[in-house]
Amino acid sequence: MKFEESMELPVIVVDSGVLLPGASLKIPIRSKLNTRTIEQHLTRGGSNYVVIAYKLSTDKIYNVATIAYIEKLFGWTFNSTTNYSLDVIGLHRANIDKLSFPKCRVSKLEDSSERAEFNHSTIENVISGAKILAQNSESLKFSQEIHNSIDDHDYGKLADLCVSQIKNLEFSQFLDFLGTKNVEKRLEMCEKWMQMQRETKALQLKMAVPGNSEIPKKINKQRIPNSKNQVEQLEEKLSAIEFSEEVSDRVFSELHRLKNMNPQQSEYTVLMNWLELVSNLPWNTSTVDDIEINKARKILEDSHESMDDVKQRVLEHLAVCKINNSVKGMILCFTGPPGIGKTSIAKAIAESMGRKFQRVSLGGIRDESDIRGHRRTYVAAMPGRIIEALKHCKSNNPVFLLDEVDKLYSGNQGSPSAALLELLDPEQNSTFHDHYLNIPFDVSKIMFIATANDVERLEPALKDRLEIIEMSGYSMKEKVKICENHLVNRQLSKHCISPDYVNLDRHAIMAMIEEFTMEAGVRQLERNVGAVCRHVALRLAEALNSDPSADVLPDMDLPIQIGEPDIHKILKAKHMKRVKIVEKMRPLPPGVCFGLSVTTNGGRVMPIEASKCKGTGKIVTTGHLGKVLEESILVAKGWLGANAEKLGLKTLEENDIHVHLPAGAVNKDGPSAGTGLACALVSLAMGVPLRSDAAVTGEISLTGHVLAIGGVKEKVLAAQREGLRRVVLPKSNEEEYLKIDEDIRNEMDVVLADTVEDVIEAMMEKEPVLAKL
């Protein structure tokens, strides 16, 4: 904007703080007069320039004002009142010619003085002080303005900039300086005030030297030497690290900045923290791989029961790593219900390779910055979880477990899943960029392993980078072995009880599994074992209290025998005994069938109930059913309607049908309930109950074909846990069924069906009554 000799501009009146040309000022708007000026002339696309006028203690307006540029205008509402704040930059001195709120007419004031009149000693003192201010300033813009003023010999502007940084002046002194047109006088005032400020700081430092007081002495001993030593130690650590050329240039450039910086500047601490992080990262520190396949096989066998397919895939992965001497390739992702050993498998892999193990929990993360860190410009910025974990690990090639990757959520702060893509891509992760670190760090030597409960919740791009290894739940036999070989010893050690003091028999373990757990894994089972150990610990403590000086436990038969009756006494008070839904619903009435489903917690038996009443053929569904499940009901009813005559059944078109799946608070969806729904409707139409010891799963087509489903092992194990002995599966799932342990297959009566008629025959209580269509 070109300023004329006289102009009219909006006016803001302040009674504290003086804006000098070249300086900046934040002005909170409190008075109604200033608020009106803003609302009438500044908030509606008005002028970007304003006059800052100054009110004296006599309520008069000082005759000299400042023409300012509005850099930012803030507005917010609090208690139904709109508040404003201005960020302004001083441009020129101005004389107030006429004041008529909310505007005033001003004329620009020019500096008066010839350079020849300046006192060279005064100029040198001001320039010297100005350079110190520029060096200590946190504002690059201010430092640049100082140097430009010195280069251009603009001493009036230089004096204004220097005085704007002096904090201990009175309001009236600032106004006197603002009203002084003569540059030489302003330089003298500036020199005088800067000298006063230096003397004040010197006095403060003198008070802090050793001997004046105990507290400054401690500060002097602890802080002042350590500040210098800390930088020297930091330089030694950084010099010992072999950086790449790009990283080295950046790190030592920042170290040079730190050395030339005043420790009292706020950026000093930020830069120091950044350099300390760089020095603590494992740039060149690695562990030597010690991959022996036989040793790895033994570690996996000793630490985990069954899971032969998973162990085989892990050994194959380790074999490739040994041959290639590299871990680049597919990233393993173990998926399955909680408590089945996904994390412990990753620990076993680290042990078998001789590498350090580092776990990062990703559950519930919504902010990309949790993965990649915050930029250093933010207050309280910190590195992301990956870099932070590497700092604690002190190795650049650990086995890195990304736990619960399916629990990542996208939000307004970005997508954490997308942030993992660079980390897990072998073509990019040699130059991984954390926002806080802001220099490339090589994470390509890390072996990444992920875990998830529900693989369907993974982002497609992230899922594409992972090799999914499914881990199923455990059978009763496997749980008993795990409990005997691992859980009991672990809990006894945790509770400091000698194995010689207690004997937990197999029937007690089976009772804990059957009656007090309902899970695919063994997490709740371990809690139950812990409860038994606490009961034993109490009995031992009570015996010791009777004779504390005894070398042996008095009046006690050891080991303490824990049988099935003891389990009921110990756990009944602590855990509600599990009631099997199968037992509760027997005997089954017509229209009721046991289906099977899979959740993130493993397989479960899902009762299906159907009832009818006179009506018009309407279908009512309850139980929090999803769209796919509701369509399966329509398919089952459509098949029954099309084949009712051939089956010799009365049509259900004259009845309203109500289909309900219990546990109404739980979402249910998926196509695998099709065969169960068809069986329930046929049973309802015939008035004949289905077998109460059988469960069924499978998708059906409208033409009566039974289609393949997923989660075969989980569903068979769920039926086994509930005491069901017959399971009807689709014929097309035979291959998955044969992968189940032979012991389980021998216990269960599994029928493989091709058509809906095969399913109904297998599910009938008595001999089949249906003829083949």
From Swiss-Prot:
Its EC number is 3.4.21.53. The gene is lonp-2. ATP-dependent serine protease that mediates the selective degradation of misfolded and unassembled polypeptides in the peroxisomal matrix. Necessary for type 2 peroxisome targeting signal (PTS2)-containing protein processing and facilitates peroxisome matrix protein import. GO terms for molecular function: ATP binding; ATP hydrolysis activity; ATP-dependent peptidase activity; serine-type endopeptidase activity. The active site is at S672, K715. This is Lon protease homolog 2, peroxisomal. A motif (Microbody targeting signal) lies at residues 771-773. GO terms for cellular component: peroxisomal matrix. Belongs to the peptidase S16 family.
